[in-house]
Every structure is written in C-alpha cells, then in structure tokens.
C-alpha cells in the first residue's frame, strides 16, 4: 500500500468516515464510510467510491442510480481520521431517498418548546424510479 494511505487513522474495522461536499456550493451532501480500497480507487478514478457496512462491499456511488460523484479534491482532517471529498454530484441527487442531500431533516422547536425533526428538502425523484425496486 502507498504511504499516503498509511497516514489515515483507520478505525478498528479498517474504516474512516468520508464527507461528500459539493465543490461549487460547499453544501454537505452525504457522509459514508471508506476502507483503504475505496479511498485508493477514489483517488485513482476520480469517482466517489465508499464501503457499504450493511452489504460489506465496495459501493461505487451512482453504479445503480446513475448519480455518480466526480471527485475534484480529497482532503484529510487535522486528526487524520476523517476524509473530505469535494465533488460534483451528477444528476443532482446524492441521497438514496431521492433528495439532493442526505441532510434533509431539520430540528425545529414549536412555541411550547417541543422539538421534532422535519423534512425540509423536497424529493427530486421517487427512489422506486431511481433503483427500479
């Protein structure tokens, strides 16, 4: 493996969190996990590749949906334990729910102090149409 991969502080499962940020707007679109293979492939191909913890395999973003992420820059945080990908989100949808961003729930508080999560971003495309379920 390359020295640059050894600089990353991988967790006990060999993973590191990765933030996908729109390179133009700065908007955070999603957070996922990467293993060494995913990070290496991302750097090599310029496409967002992650590790699916539920499926235990590489997840090439957009492979099923067509919503590919083109990576323009890869950064490592000051503690070497978080990756930041500056990306262009092709198709404008990063979330499997059919929204632009996975961060569509906003904590709101009513007049009585009751807090709740409210979906604030529209569904751009029905997930059933995206994934042909």
UniProtKB/Swiss-Prot annotation:
Pathway: Amino-acid biosynthesis; L-histidine biosynthesis; L-histidine from 5-phospho-alpha-D-ribose 1-diphosphate: step 3/9
Amino-acid positions noted as binding Mg(2+) in the UniProt annotation, renumbered to this chain: 77, 79, 81
Binding residues for Zn(2+): 78, 95, 102
Cofactor note: Binds 1 Mg(2+) ion per subunit.
GO cellular component entries: cytoplasm
The reaction(s) this protein catalyses: 1-(5-phospho-beta-D-ribosyl)-5'-AMP + H2O = 1-(5-phospho-beta-D-ribosyl)-5-[(5-phospho-beta-D-ribosylamino)methylideneamino]imidazole-4-carboxamide
Gene Ontology MF terms in the entry: magnesium ion binding; phosphoribosyl-AMP cyclohydrolase activity; zinc ion binding
UniProt keywords, alphabetically: Amino-acid biosynthesis, Cytoplasm, Histidine biosynthesis, Hydrolase, Magnesium, Metal-binding, Zinc
Disulfide bridges in this chain: none
Obligatory cofactor(s): Mg(2+); Zn(2+)
Broad EC category: hydrolase
Subcellular location: Cytoplasm
Pfam family, one: PRA-CH
Enzyme Commission (EC) number: 3.5.4.19
Subunit structure: Homodimer.
Similarity comment: Belongs to the PRA-CH family.
Known role: Catalyzes the hydrolysis of the adenine ring of phosphoribosyl-AMP.
PANTHER family assigned to the protein according to its UniProt record, in alphabetical order: HISTIDINE BIOSYNTHESIS BIFUNCTIONAL PROTEIN, HISTIDINE BIOSYNTHESIS BIFUNCTIONAL PROTEIN HIS7
Name assigned to this protein: Phosphoribosyl-AMP cyclohydrolase
Gene: hisI
């Amino acid at each position: 493996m390359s020295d640059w991969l050894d600089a990353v502080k991988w967790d006990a499962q060999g993973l590191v969190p990765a933030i996908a940020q729109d390179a133009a707007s700065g908007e955070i679109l999603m957070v996922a996990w990467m293993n060494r293979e995913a990070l290496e492939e991302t750097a090599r191909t310029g496409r967002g590749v992650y590790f699916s913890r539920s499926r235990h395999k590489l997840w090439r973003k957009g492979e099923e949906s067509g919503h590919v992420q083109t990576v323009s820059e890869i950064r490592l945080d000051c503690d070497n334990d978080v990756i930041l990908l500056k990306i262009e989100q092709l198709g404008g949808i990063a979330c499997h729910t059919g929204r632009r961003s996975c961060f569509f729930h906003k904590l709101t508080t009513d007049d009585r102090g009751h807090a709740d999560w409210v979906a604030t971003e529209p569904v751009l495309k029905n997930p059933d149409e995206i994934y042909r379920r």
